[in-house]
Curated annotation (Swiss-Prot):
Reactions performed catalytically: (2S)-2-hydroxy-3-oxobutyl phosphate + 5-amino-6-(D-ribitylamino)uracil = 6,7-dimethyl-8-(1-D-ribityl)lumazine + phosphate + 2 H2O + H(+)
Pfam families in the record: DMRL_synthase
Residues holding 5-amino-6-(D-ribitylamino)uracil: 22, 57-59, 81-83, 114
Record pathway: Cofactor biosynthesis; riboflavin biosynthesis; riboflavin from 2-hydroxy-3-oxobutyl phosphate and 5-amino-6-(D-ribitylamino)uracil: step 1/2
Swiss-Prot/TrEMBL keywords: Riboflavin biosynthesis, Transferase
A GO molecular function held by the record: 6,7-dimethyl-8-ribityllumazine synthase activity
Encoding gene per record: ribH
Protein name: 6,7-dimethyl-8-ribityllumazine synthase
Length: 156
């Protein structure tokens, strides 16, 4: 029986990080975690990491699609934070962001790691951006690295 499982090192990988500016006080911690993980665990050089900023989570899928369309990248890490408010807006933003990023991944057969926090409170966001609950940006970067290697193994 053959088992395909990807590791984390991907020293030649080219990674795009698409990140929303809205809630940047959280997102910058996610970005730091993602970059640190790509460099330490993935052995990815800083020259092979591109950061693309956009206004908010709703814009992430379009930016990810344009990045994927270039064919220059082996994976995309998406980062952002959506915090529930008093209206249904939260549900729409989270749903469309998630669906759009998944669509880009399937359309371009490219790993698009989901590092978008969808939380009820600012405290929950802070916990997931490098304190009690780890750093979800780092986790998304690990997912992207692993998927690069899994897909490479499948194709070989």
């Amino acid at each position: 029986m053959k088992v395909i499982e990807g590791g984390f090192p991907a020293p030649n990988a080219k990674i795009a990080i698409v990140i929303s500016r809205f809630n940047s006080f959280i997102n910058e911690s996610l970005l730091s975690g993602a970059i640190d993980t790509l460099k330490r665990h993935g052995q990815v050089s800083e020259d092979n990491i591109t950061v693309v900023r956009c206004p908010g989570a709703v814009e992430l899928p379009l930016v990810a699609q344009r990045v994927a369309k270039t064919g220059k990248y082996d994976a995309i890490v998406s980062l952002g934070t959506v915090i529930r408010g008093g209206t249904p807006h939260f549900d729409y933003v989270c749903s469309e962001c998630n669906k759009g990023l998944a669509q880009v991944s399937l359309e371009y057969s490219l790993p698009v790691a989901f590092g978008v926090l969808t939380v009820d409170t600012i405290d929950q966001a802070i916990e997931r951006a490098g304190t009690k609950a780890g750093n979800k940006g780092a986790e998304a970067a690990l997912s992207a690295l692993e998927m690069i290697n899994v897909l490479s193994e499948i194709d070989s």
